[in-house]
């Protein structure tokens, strides 16, 4: 008998021990990400052919202490490789792990390859050739700290490749993981099984193969053990023939049925093709449909729903997933009372949206991604309680939901009267729900303020999930129109940095002016909502005047001035992107011509050198900036007098500067302004719109004129 290592994923060791025991192995012992055991050739052939959980089987030829490359080389040369395979065989070395001395797996693989080749050449035999793509044998090496395991892969490529799947959906499960999920679900193979988000059908096919007793390795064309000197082809043919007969008989005996539902017709066709190649197509019914509306099949008593819903790398990028899990959970309770469910996801927060209590839960990895599998018993429910399911969802966060309702009734009506289709609905009104929510027509932008360090991450995630669910429910908005961002304390121009490349813009209306916003690609959208009253006022002041807009951003103030009848406009910003955006905003409102100038420049430098004069100047500088493109830092509190000194030179005798900034507790240096011959009037309270009335320090705004 030889000693073997069955390789599997972390967390599946004990499940694999059970499987190997059923295959006739009596001494299986779990180790990290694997199981060790002894087996005859017949037993290992059977294990390779029948294991649904192992990714490979390795014949162990040596285990040794390995501190450095010399230990690795000497221990490898001590193996009599000539006894294992002929020199004509092509090899590749799969080296896994590093330690203090062997820091590179490629280097480790090279040392093992050199040692094996030297074993043959020292016996005056031809040297085996190395071929990554055409290898007959894979030499397997595991190195962890000072412990090394050296062996021969009995399989070759991973056992997850069953042969039935030539293409998959967007996020396919490995077949070995799918089999583990089926086994962990507690499914009784005599009961029907439904996957309402089946994708390419892997879960269903693996379950159907179990029910039909089809060996998962039957379709594999090449095995590593076939290249070994002790390979027994007749014995292997017998083991394989026996499995083939069992599979053909098994399909005919299966009485249970399998149901697959997916909302992508192309992927469903792939699933059907995969099932046909696996030999189980007659056992599975595939249907186009929505998981959130899935109906219970006939004769589904005591059946089980098993699925791997989408979960995304980051919860925040997929608010739609929260709505999906919420609706799916409600549908499970409405349609599948008395049945079981097993759901696999990387996100415990998304699983909580199902609003079901798990009977059991397991931790599994999908590749490197830690995941949860939760098993549920779905209680029988009375019909009238099911009909109320949707309205009960807002009770997850009742205080928050009620505040949203109250705000929308007040602010929504005001916005409609004012001719606004974008406004702030909620701004951390309740401390425990620390977000800002802005409405842009039929879209929501939820900005999460970074949670304090003393709030546990899991608690913050769960609360954010509740916020998104309640907002979708109360405001009746399509979950795909919800955008989530995390807002932290800004440094310099970080609020203008690009977050994505979706380029999904939309056109909004503000007091009759049309503007373009982008909810996806930047932290800010291209429009500061707190300045809507300021912009309207600029439009009212601009008739027949030469208008200057500094730190112009996307030029929304320029558009209001132009639409208000400005004789000319000059828009200055350092960003080429935002100036192009400003031009698009102007063109959208029919404001084109030479009287409208756009200048890409450092506003402070431009201001110091400018000679033209203006009747109306709007300047809304950053609180602080240290942009690499600026020659010096800027602090609005420190530098506002210098700013006014330069602005005074450009201001005509009867002109007005509208000066705004976002620094909390900003103090205007009235004495310095008076010395410059300027008057300043604080109009902050006049420019604060209703949707920002709870945040009176969102900005401060001043009218500055020459002294008479």
UniProtKB/Swiss-Prot annotation:
Job description of the protein: Specifically methylates the guanine in position 2445 (m2G2445) and the guanine in position 2069 (m7G2069) of 23S rRNA.
Localization (cell): Cytoplasm
PROSITE patterns with a match to the protein in the record: THUMP, UPF0020
UniProt EC number: 2.1.1.173, 2.1.1.264
Primary location recorded for the protein, binned into one broad class: cytoplasm
Gene3D superfamilies, sorted: 3.30.2130.30, RNA methyltransferase domain (HRMD) like, Vaccinia Virus protein VP39
Pfam families found in the cross-reference section: Methyltrans_SAM, RlmL_1st, THUMP, UPF0020
Gene (UniProt): rlmL
Residue span, THUMP domain: 43-154
MF terms (GO), sorted A to Z: 23S rRNA (guanine(2445)-N(2))-methyltransferase activity; RNA binding; rRNA (guanine-N2-)-methyltransferase activity; rRNA (guanine-N7-)-methyltransferase activity
GO terms under cellular component: cytoplasm
Name of the protein in question: Ribosomal RNA large subunit methyltransferase K/L
């Amino acid at each position: 008998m030889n000693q073997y290592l069955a390789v599997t994923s972390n967390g599946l060791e004990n499940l694999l021990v059970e499987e190997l025991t059923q295959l006739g192995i009596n001494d299986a012992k779990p180790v990290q990400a694997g199981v060790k055991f002894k087996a005859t050739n017949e037993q290992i052939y059977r294990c390779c052919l029948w294991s649904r959980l192992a990714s490979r089987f390795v014949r162990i030829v040596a285990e040794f202490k390995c501190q450095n490359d010399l230990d690795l080389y000497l221990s490898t040369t001590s193996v009599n490789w000539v006894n294992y395979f002929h020199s004509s065989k092509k090899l590749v070395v799969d080296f896994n792990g590093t330690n203090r001395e062997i820091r590179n797996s490629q280097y480790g693989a090279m040392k093992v390859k050199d040692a094996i080749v030297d074993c043959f050449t020292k016996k005056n035999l031809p040297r085996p050739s190395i071929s990554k793509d055409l290898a007959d044998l894979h030499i397997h090496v595991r190195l962890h700290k000072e412990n090394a395991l050296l062996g021969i892969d009995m399989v070759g490529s991973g056992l997850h490749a069953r042969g039935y799947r030539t293409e998959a959906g967007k996020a396919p499960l490995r077949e070995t993981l799918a089999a583990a999920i089926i086994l962990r679900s507690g499914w009784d193979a005599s009961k029907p099984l439904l996957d309402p988000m089946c994708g390419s059908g892997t879960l269903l096919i693996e379950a159907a193969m179990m029910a039909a007793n089809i060996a998962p390795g039957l379709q594999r064309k090449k095995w590593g053990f076939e290249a070994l000197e002790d390979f027994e082809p007749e014995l292997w043919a017998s083991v394989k023939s026996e499995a083939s007969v069992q599979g053909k008989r098994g399909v005919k005996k299966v009485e249970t049925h399998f149901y697959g539902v997916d909302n992508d017709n192309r992927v469903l066709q792939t699933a059907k093709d995969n099932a046909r190649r696996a030999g189980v197509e007659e056992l599975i019914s595939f249907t186009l449909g929505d998981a959130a509306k899935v109906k219970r099949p006939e004769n589904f008593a005591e059946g089980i729903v098993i699925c791997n819903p989408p979960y995304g790398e980051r919860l925040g990028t997929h608010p739609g997933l929260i709505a999906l899990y919420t609706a799916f959970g409600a549908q499970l309770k409405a349609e599948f009372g008395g049945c079981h469910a097993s759901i696999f996801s990387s996100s415990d927060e998304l699983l909580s949206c199902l609003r079901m209590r798990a009977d059991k839960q397991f931790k599994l990895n999908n590749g490197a991604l830690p995941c949860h599998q939760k098993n549920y018993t779905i209680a029988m429910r009375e019909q009238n309680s099911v009909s109320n399911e949707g309205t009960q969802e807002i009770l997850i966060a009742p205080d928050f939901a009620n505040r949203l309702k109250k705000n929308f009734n007040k602010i929504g009506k005001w916005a409609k009267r004012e001719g606004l289709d974008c406004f702030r609905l909620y701004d951390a009104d309740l401390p425990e729900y620390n977000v800002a929510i802005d409405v842009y027509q039929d879209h929501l932008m939820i900005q999460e303020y970074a949670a304090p360090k003393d709030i546990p991450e899991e608690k913050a995630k769960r609360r954010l999930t509740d916020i998104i669910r309640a907002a979708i429910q109360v405001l009746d908005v399509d979950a795909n129109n919800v955008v989530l961002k995390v807002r932290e304390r800004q440094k310099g121009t970080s609020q203008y940095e690009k977050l994505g490349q979706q380029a999904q813009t939309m056109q909004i209306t503000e007091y009759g002016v049309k503007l373009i916003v982008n909810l996806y690609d930047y932290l800010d959208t291209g429009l500061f909502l707190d300045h809507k009253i300021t912009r309207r006022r600029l439009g009212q002041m601009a008739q027949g005047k030469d208008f200057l807009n500094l730190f112009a951003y996307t030029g929304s103030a320029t558009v209001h001035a132009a639409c208000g009848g400005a004789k000319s406009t000059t828009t200055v910003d350092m960003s080429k992107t935002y100036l192009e955006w400003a031009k698009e905003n102007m063109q959208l409102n029919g404001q084109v011509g030479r009287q409208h100038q756009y200048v890409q420049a450092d506003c402070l430098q431009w201001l110091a050198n400018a000679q033209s004069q203006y009747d109306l100047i709007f300047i809304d500088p950053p609180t602080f900036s240290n942009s690499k493109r600026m020659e010096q830092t800027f602090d609005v509190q420190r530098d506002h007098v210098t700013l006014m000194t330069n602005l005074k030179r450009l201001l005509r005798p009867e002109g007005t500067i509208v000066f705004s900034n976002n620094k909390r507790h900003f103090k205007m240096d009235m004495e310095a302004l008076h010395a410059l011959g300027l008057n300043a009037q604080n109009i902050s309270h006049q420019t604060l719109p209703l949707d920002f009335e709870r945040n009176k320090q969102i900005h401060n705004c001043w009218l500055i004129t020459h002294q008479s």
